Curated annotation (Swiss-Prot):
The keyword Glycoprotein does not apply. It comes from Staphylococcus saprophyticus subsp. saprophyticus (strain ATCC 15305 / DSM 20229 / NCIMB 8711 / NCTC 7292 / S-41). The lineage of its organism: Bacteria, Bacillati, Bacillota, Bacilli, Bacillales. InterPro entries: RpoY (IPR009907). Disulfide bonds: none annotated. Coiled coil: none annotated. Pfam families: RpoY. This is DNA-directed RNA polymerase subunit epsilon. A non-essential component of RNA polymerase (RNAP). One of its GO terms (molecular function) is DNA binding. It comes from the Bacteria. GO terms for cellular component: DNA-directed RNA polymerase complex. It is an enzyme of class 2 (transferase).
Amino acid sequence: MAVFKVFYQHNKEEVIVREHTQTIYVEAQTEEQVRRYLKDRNFNIEFIAKLEGAHLEYEKQSDHFNVEQAE
């Protein structure tokens, strides 16, 4: 399993505004599994980044680091 950081907007009907970008962390095997896990939410996904090594350790230090488990 890997941890992915998902950058998204809350409403897929609206134009993307960088200042409104939100993030969530999802543990999954692939990016495709992350997309399937989030498909029922009304998110406009901008980008999905796989976190590894030093980048993952850095993100873990954030107060907002809360990982959801993809099913």
